[in-house]
């Protein structure tokens, strides 16, 4: 099996000229022979393939991943499309943080200036409306990183931080992976929580998390079913079945959170075993 990976970088370049260049490249590379399967991941790539796929790759099955239910609502997906939805559970992580810090009165929500950050912060704000009588929310969205770090270093008491991706800041600076999150957790005067397992190890306490690895496996299984002869229209769009409570042991110690306060079945990463644990 030959797998070709195309990194579109639509987060940083999304103008019409750039998109046309991408389409021309795909036409040149994949018109003959056509691929047997296309797997776009995350909103920008999925939107591009759904819009232009029928012209570029007529009849080629599409299995998408990394998008929420709202993304596909009211979209005409076509008969050769199926996929795997991952609905981010913002309230699960917020409930967790409020339970572990019962004296919380303020929640600072952090997100970047790019399309991913803006989209997720909008969904997050909508999800958190039900909590507005319980705690005050401050939305730190699209700030230059230096300004964001200054605010996080001087948060009021009884605050927790809910971090969404900061892949681009308000000054136009781009960040790779968890680069910005590591800086956020290092300076924050309050514990930081998030909702994706790939964020564990950056200095966040933890969260009620979905797994990139499990999502990838699920998308791959759908793709294999199609390559083995099933038709996309016969495979229902699937939703992520489970979320996991996951924590960084080092941050539990940093913020004096007792392990017996964690939900049953929690996964604790980076735990340093004592001699009693080992023997």
Where are these regions (language model features)?
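Short hydrophobic alpha-helices and adjacent helix-cap/hinge residues
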Residues: 1-278
